[in-house]
Regions:
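Extracellular beta-strand/beta-solenoid scaffold signature
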Residues: 7-15, 31-48, 52, 64-73, ...
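Right-handed parallel beta-helix
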Residues: 1-10, 19-34, 38-39, 50-66, ...
Length: 189
């Protein structure tokens, strides 16, 4: 709580290897070379870690990341991402939700993940480190399906890439049943 993290070459904070019931709150994360905040439900290196569970990122400012997302969610269950200001992430998405890495991903997500009441300002790119297009919110499914995620009441402002929400699978304007999008404001004036 109330932390300041500046200019490192990796994630600002990464909950991994079975982290449960942990919160980053009222903190400022700036200038990171990977995700500002991340939840990574990994089982890499032959570990038998449990899935990430019930973690929260609340009322933080994440700014000026230069390689990845402001906030990255790579699986687990029961997380809440709320009240964050994510701004000036010029080389990636403001919020990234995906199954790119091996791990528990969203297979055990029976309690749902809520991403709401965040403001994403001047984020996204047409050419990230992997030569991919990332919107203010980006979904990518590689190793399994993203499921039971609700994204609502967020503000996506002055985004740096179109479309504002990017994905590598079929999904309508309101989601696809497993991902629910509602009442998100997009303003690129």
């Amino acid at each position: 709580e109330n932390a300041r993290i500046r200019n490192n070459l990796a994630d600002g904070i990464n909950f991994a290897q079975g982290t449960k019931n942990s919160t980053v709150k009222n903190s400022n994360i700036r200038g990171n070379g990977d995700d500002g905040l991340a939840i990574w439900s990994s089982i890499s290196d032959g570990t038998n870690a449990a899935a990430e569970e019930n973690n929260k990122f609340l009322n933080n400012t994440i700014e000026s990341g230069w390689r990845a997302a402001g906030i990255g969610i790579f699986g687990g269950k029961g997380h809440e991402i709320s009240g964050n200001l994510i701004k000036d992430v010029f080389a990636g998405a403001g919020i990234r939700v995906n199954t790119v890495f091996a791990g528990h991903n969203f297979d055990l997500n029976d309690s749902g993940i809520k991403i709401h009441d965040n403001t994403i300002l001047r984020s996204g790119t047409t050419n990230d480190l992997y030569n991919l297009h990332r919107g203010a919110i980006d979904f990518q499914q590689v190793r399994g399906t993203i499921k039971n995620v609700a994204i609502y009441d967020n503000k996506l402002l002055n985004t740096l890439a179109e479309p504002v929400i990017t994905k590598n699978f079929e999904m309508g304007d309101n989601g696809n049943g497993e991902i629910r999008l509602s009442n998100n404001t997009i303003d690129n004036k």
